[in-house]
């Protein structure tokens, strides 16, 4: 007889293999079939269905998994310590390392339509907001939360640039320059 801890360990490894495979497959092929994900995970399609009976179940689990990875990356980047520019750079690098699956998760209609997931996504980046607030100057023309929106928009541009093959260091530098200096210099009149 198998002990419960061994069984749950094997079950967790299988679950993780399915989620990791889904991250890789769906980032490149958003409409990929569950069979493609199963093959990438090294399991049968019936195994995927045992863990995630419907595609939406897998997508919900994937969304939570990616969001949790993002939060863990934020924590590892330690954005509350050190000079603000170094803290921002560490956060940008940590988020960029998650790759294009972030675009899929945050733009997949079936995920966006889930109010529970929307609430779940709205937490976790408080440390980023804190470092952005440390770096930002009060600008009355900016609505509340603007720096956060700009940060995530630049990250989206970074994920897209990475998919297009732009070197990582150029992406990080471009995001940092955009955050700290902007991208447009108007002629002085």
Curated annotation (Swiss-Prot):
DNA-binding region: 33-52
Residue span, HTH tetR-type domain: 12-70
Keyword tags: DNA-binding, Repressor, Transcription, Transcription regulation
Observed effect of gene inactivation: Deletion of the gene increases the expression of lfrA and produces higher resistance to multiple drugs.
Activity regulation, per record: Repressor activity is regulated by binding of different substrates of the LfrA multidrug efflux pump, such as acriflavine, proflavine, ethidium bromide and rhodamine 123. Binding of these ligands causes the dissociation of LfrR from the promoter, inducing lfrA expression.
Pfam families, alphabetized: TetR_N
GO molecular function: DNA-binding transcription factor activity; transcription cis-regulatory region binding
Keyword DNA-binding assigned: yes
Keyword Transcription carried by entry: yes
Region Proflavine binding, residue ranges: 70-71
Induction context: Negatively autoregulated.
Domains as described in the record: Binding of ligands causes significant conformational changes.
Self-association and partners: Homodimer. Forms a structurally asymmetric homodimer exhibiting local unfolding and a blocked drug-binding site.
Protein purpose: Represses the transcription of the lfrRA operon by binding directly to the promoter region of lfrR-lfrA. Binds specifically to a 143-bp region upstream of the lfrR gene.
Name of the featured protein: HTH-type transcriptional repressor LfrR
The species this protein was found in: Mycolicibacterium smegmatis (strain ATCC 700084 / mc(2)155)
